[in-house]
């Protein structure tokens, strides 16, 4: 446990950030999973809606610094690729 006042606060804020980031990442996995399920079922309309939600959440997470912007871009690209192959 740190002795310096600023470091004590840092430990608290880091823990808050960790919990928040963990929740956001968990939600991201859920949104992507929902898209994959819709895509595997062959439901183009549901997959399109799920892809829109997943892409929006990925962008939000990247802008907040939870995930790197390139990781968000790669995931969005994979979602788009799968959606396009489904529609074709």
Curated annotation (Swiss-Prot):
| A biological process term (GO) from this entry | translation
Residues forming coiled coils: none
* Chain spans, region Disordered: 1-25, 68-88
GO CC, one annotated term = small ribosomal subunit
**Bilayer-crossing regions:** none
Lineage, top-rank taxon, reads Bacteria
Q: Supply the InterPro entries for this chain.
A: Ribosomal_bS20, Ribosomal_bS20_sf
The molecular function terms of the Gene Ontology recorded here are: small ribosomal subunit rRNA binding; structural constituent of ribosome
Write down a Pfam family by its short name: Ribosomal_S20p
Task: Identify the keywords attached in UniProt to this record, alphabetized.
Answer: Ribonucleoprotein, Ribosomal protein, RNA-binding, rRNA-binding
Q: Which cysteines are joined by disulfide bonds?
A: none
Q: What family is reported?
A: Belongs to the bacterial ribosomal protein bS20 family.
Q: What does this protein do?
A: Binds directly to 16S ribosomal RNA.
What is the protein named? Small ribosomal subunit protein bS20
Q: Which organism is it from?
A: Cutibacterium acnes (strain DSM 16379 / KPA171202)
């Amino acid at each position: 446990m740190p002795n310096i006042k600023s470091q004590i606060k840092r430990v608290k804020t880091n823990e808050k950030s960790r919990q928040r980031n963990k929740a956001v990442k968990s939600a991201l996995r859920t949104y992507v999973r929902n898209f994959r399920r819709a895509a595997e079922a062959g439901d183009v309309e549901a997959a399109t809606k799920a892809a829109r939600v997943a892409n929006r959440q990925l962008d939000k997470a990247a802008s907040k610094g939870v995930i790197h912007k390139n990781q968000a871009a790669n995931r969005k690209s994979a979602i788009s690729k799968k959606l396009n192959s489904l529609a074709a």
